[in-house]
């Protein structure tokens, strides 16, 4: 009791200083309108309240209605400018490193690692990004990655039994995880070590999106344990290759990302470990959710499935005699497929917002963004803006074929933008296109029970997106 009484004056002083700081900032700057919410807590819990993935949620709707598309708040423990404005979002992303920099909560860096590309800034981020870009270059996509994408697609689809019911979300995760494990460390699907890594990764992901409470039994604590297990696997692979290299016994494995980072960069072991872990996270989780969304939206739009199937029937008949598998030229013919991919990403919004911080005082549209303030460009709010997209809550892949498609594309940021544009965006589109090609040619599907995607803010299908499939004969 005595200890609590001693803490009370400290808490009151801290609260007073916090309120005084906010008030001084308001007087000094012409801030956007908004609300600071509760001291310290701000409005974070309301902002993160789960809602339908094809909406921006009650919090955003109410704040935009009351304050406009640019407003201030207090989120994640920091004063924040929230932007549902397409022009400001582009301005923030295009001025990375000059006016703004990446600024995720510390808990993200704690679990992904301090050398993760998601949290790095400056020269180190540039160097890590270059390694990733070179590994996933257009030439490698054509020659090395596309055949493997098709192989992993067929492995998953051929395991489906006629008339069976299963989780499409889990199948999508299995597909993208096996693909990334193969690309990153040449690990084959179904092998005990690969399956162990996948189980650890499931635990790891639950912690990434949980509250950062690090004590035994919490998802965050379990995720840190899984992080250690995953890194141990990567480190063991590194040591095996160093041993083979010392013996002059190289191999095909050196052509994966681990070999690429070891042989064509000056990265330290710790940096390579965090790089591979973060790319496994980025390449698996977002791509699998995007694919699950496409399956979900297509199920309720038979016209789109019909047009998609017609396109892929024509493509499958265009192959050259003796040619095995899809060619790059055939992939480039998948025009409507890319409309479906774009629309799934626009409506579903896998990446709903990003974290940035002003590194100097910035003025925009008459408002001040003070140095040190967080800025959240909310892509979902732009993608679902009725002034930019007609009937924005309807799945309409044909909108990407219209005369206004250039305007539509200008406001489309599913992979971020600027210096931090997702390095795996082309690979992600390739994965979805190849999977959809074989899916629509070989199967019909329907939802086994009513379902919808929710934003937590990470996306998830609460029931796993259960579907029932029937083979096309």
Swiss-Prot record:
Mainly expressed in leaves and roots and, at low levels, in fruits and stems. One of its GO terms (molecular function) is oxidoreductase activity, acting on paired donors, with incorporation or reduction of molecular oxygen. It is a single-pass membrane protein. It is found in: Membrane. Changing residue 149 to S: Mimicking CYP90G4, increased cholesterol 16S,22S-dihydroxylase activity and production of furostanol-type steroid. Pathway: Steroid metabolism; cholesterol metabolism. It is an enzyme of class 1 (oxidoreductase). Changing residue 109 to A: Mimicking CYP90G4, increased cholesterol 16S,22S-dihydroxylase activity and production of furostanol-type steroid. Its EC number is 1.14.14.-. It comes from the Eukaryota. GO terms for biological process: brassinosteroid biosynthetic process; brassinosteroid homeostasis; cholesterol metabolic process; steroid biosynthetic process. It catalyses: cholesterol + reduced [NADPH--hemoprotein reductase] + O2 = (22S)-22-hydroxycholesterol + oxidized [NADPH--hemoprotein reductase] + H2O + H(+). One of its GO terms (cellular component) is membrane. Keywords: Brassinosteroid biosynthesis, Cholesterol metabolism, Iron, Lipid biosynthesis, Lipid metabolism, Membrane, Metal-binding, Oxidoreductase, Steroid biosynthesis, Steroid metabolism, Sterol metabolism, Transmembrane, Transmembrane helix. Disulfide bonds: none annotated. The chain crosses the membrane at residues 2-22. Changing residue 203 to S: Mimicking CYP90G4, increased cholesterol 16S,22S-dihydroxylase activity and production of furostanol-type steroid. Heme binds at residue 422. Belongs to the cytochrome P450 family. Canonical brassinosteroid (BR)-biosynthetic enzyme capable of converting cholesterol to 22S-hydroxycholesterol via sterol-C22 hydroxylation. This is Cholesterol 22-monohydroxylase CYP90B52. It comes from Paris polyphylla (Daiswa polyphylla). The gene is CYP90B52.
